[in-house]
């Protein structure tokens, strides 16, 4: 008799647990459908337009740069001399923050551009000409862009070398190294000649 009672109690517990699991799944699916319906209503009611300028401004503000849309010169209002000095100090502070941000952001690009200028033989431009920024009467700092260094056109580059990439210099060295394919190397054939390779080094 005790065995039958234990079996009945275990069966009742399993039924209760199964019903609770089914109820939780039903409630979860119901909440998911409600959220999906709310999202559909929001998507139908709102109009989403992609604005590159707004994306650019939000990205700069996220990184700590004070940037806004410059709608033109402010209306002519008589200002006293202390107000003009305060606006000039705020302008210089914002401009210095923007310049610091640009310098920190473009430090790896500057190293890459210096290396490219050294390889291509282009004279390096002074930093003062790049970072020069005219002052205006706008209270918002103007964005500063780094110009890409001049690169040679692809039509002036030398032709493709045998089994190699195109050489970026005008005077390409003469290479006399034989090409070894993977099947040749798999067979263990040493196709490299030590003498021409040593001459290149």
Curated annotation (Swiss-Prot):
InterPro entries the UniProt entry points to: TEX38
Keyword Transmembrane part of the UniProt annotation: yes
Main location: membrane
Annotated transmembrane regions: 3-23
Keywords for this protein: Membrane, Transmembrane, Transmembrane helix
Localization terms from the record: Membrane
GO CC aspect terms: membrane
Membrane found in the keyword field: yes
Membrane topology recorded in Swiss-Prot or TrEMBL: Single-pass membrane protein
Pfam families per the UniProt record, alphabetical: THEG4
Protein name: Testis-expressed protein 38
